[in-house]
Amino acid sequence: MSDRIDRDVINALIAGHFADPFSVLGMHKTTAGLEVRALLPDATDVWVIEPKTGRKLAKLECLDSRGFFSGVIPRRKNFFRYQLAVVWHGQQNLIDDPYRFGPLIQEMDAWLLSEGTHLRPYETLGAHADTMDGVTGTRFSVWAPNARRVSVVGQFNYWDGRRHPMRLRKESGIWELFIPGAHNGQLYKYEMIDANGNLRLKSDPYAFEAQMRPETASLICGLPEKVVQTEERKKANQFDAPISIYEVHLGSWRRHTDNNFWLSYRELADQLVPYAKWMGFTHLELLPINEHPFDGSWGYQPTGLYAPTRRFGTRDDFRYFIDAAHAAGLNVILDWVPGHFPTDDFALAEFDGTNLYEHSDPREGYHQDWNTLIYNYGRREVSNFLVGNALYWIERFGIDALRVDAVASMIYRDYSRKEGEWIPNEFGGRENLEAIEFLRNTNRILGEQVSGAVTMAEESTDFPGVSRPQDMGGLGFWYKWNLGWMHDTLDYMKLDPIYRQYHHDKLTFGMLYNNTENFVLPLSHDEVVHGKKSILDRMPGDAWQKFANLRAYYGWMWAFPGKKLLFMGNEFAQGREWNHDASLDWHLLEGGDNWHHGVQRLVRDLNLTYRHHKAMHELDFDPYGFEWLVVDDKERSVLIFVRRDKEGNEIIVASNFTPVPRHDYRFGINQPGKWREILNTDSMHYHGSNAGNGGTVHSDEIASHGRQHSLSLTLPPLATIWLVREAE
């Protein structure tokens, strides 16, 4: 008889409490010879089969009626390839034994994963189609170092955790198993007995696709092919490029009118992409599309960082959408959320029964504002999971930029916390040093591995050097959202024009710090929710004045140094706040030509004009690219400045933020000659009053504002005009 398997071991295996199934199951050399053991619940008969001939080599004895079989193979001494013929419910099935295969993860991969320096952990962890010893199937790997047992359960094994317990690689805390026959399209999860002895079902942190909510299973889905970065896409992200971003929530941009259901990724490719291109935008920014359980989070509480949400279609459908955007000349920015994750039990929270991905102390690991958990960036495997995710979206989907959400909440330990609710760092400070290092490391790796892709930070404080290189002490982002500019200018615009003279500095203050960062000027989704009103509705006055104010503001914004970002609906002056459960108010553009059409035409013309003239974008972050001509006329709420390109070509921008037209308004200029009006937000084309300067105006050799030559203009009411100097 063979080496006897202890009854306690059999009981533990069947109960799912045995942590080392490979030490028992599969083929083993024993004193009696070569022995095969299998755990096959509900099986009645099991034979060992010679694959080449189909010959039955031995029948396994049922040692436990719950499905434990064992038997010695006669006349065999060395390990060989075999299959099992298993009879279930009177039907014979030929299967490959998962427990005859050796370790899956290579030593170098295991070492890099443990060190947290594996550039692409998603190529090893998760579910991957594979062929081993001529057998096709799927290899599964999951990091859960404190679990007592982990099994793969899914459609291929009746969701029975007894059937496929995994091998623990103790050196890395990773559990692994190759399951023959498991294939793309099948659902799976990890069933584990956690560190506390509780039975848990967990989705795969590295799942590349997932079920549609409210279901939570992962989907076997191979890695997508890498997307080549083109020189055109790289160039479109550069500091001197025109960048005008259309920020979109895919679930509410437009919906089916008959049932209010979302458009699919492919429908969005056919509708959203050509619309954004026609409007003249250069980039699409998508609110998070990572899988998330709660629609009301807008994607900012993700549970599946590696899986595009199934709300709008499959992973391949999302790839189709990205490809369509690129074909239309649009770069794609993805909102990325490495700052926190939800508490849902099926996901990362207490993954193996311990605080594996999060901090154990709620003063470090819990966001009371959002009821979410904070990643433990100091744990190597966690930061590796996140850095790898950033690279994954860029390499495997062709994402051109990542906009990192809520950076301030990551880099400050006392973010939104009272005294006593946070733990200082090792030096007694408030900075989260591990998060800062994580962000720097992410930006460094992206710069090295996918040069041309960029990152943008939503950072709401004055933390120094967010968009400065790391060798200068910065975080290494390419761009930073200028939330201060946004708040100041919106606070100014909501004032009745009669009071604006007392708040003139709200429009000028931004230039005092403009060159400290590489700024994006954002009118984002955050400004049209939670009772803040729409941008249009914040403007003072009657309907005519509201639209005129908005047009003047857009003209100012597109001319001011910094890249542009506009949330969907603002391009046609939607009057309501954004509702993530409904379509934008496209009906405002139905019927006859109206004020909303005027704003839409203006935004399109702003984009096209801004892109055409290098002076409006080439030197956004160089002091030479901007100069005030009139900065102190607060009594009349007039501001005039010059934008300049590398060759010295200038565009004059003049704004009048009162409803009083200013006739014969004289100001000094640098370059005498004939100036042509290339944009006037008061144009009749945009439903303005059509005041202006008749197309062109000549300078006079009359000194003004310390300059020898000057222009005398009509400044339309509540309007911004752009003028370019005609060639001699």
Curated annotation (Swiss-Prot):
The keyword Transferase applies. Its EC number is 2.4.1.18. Coiled coil: none annotated. Pathway: Glycan biosynthesis; glycogen biosynthesis. Pfam families: Alpha-amylase, Alpha-amylase_C, CBM_48, GlgB_N. The active site is at residues 405, 458. NCBIfam families: branching_enzym, PRK05402.1, PRK12313.1. Belongs to the glycosyl hydrolase 13 family. GlgB subfamily. This is 1,4-alpha-glucan branching enzyme GlgB. The gene is glgB.
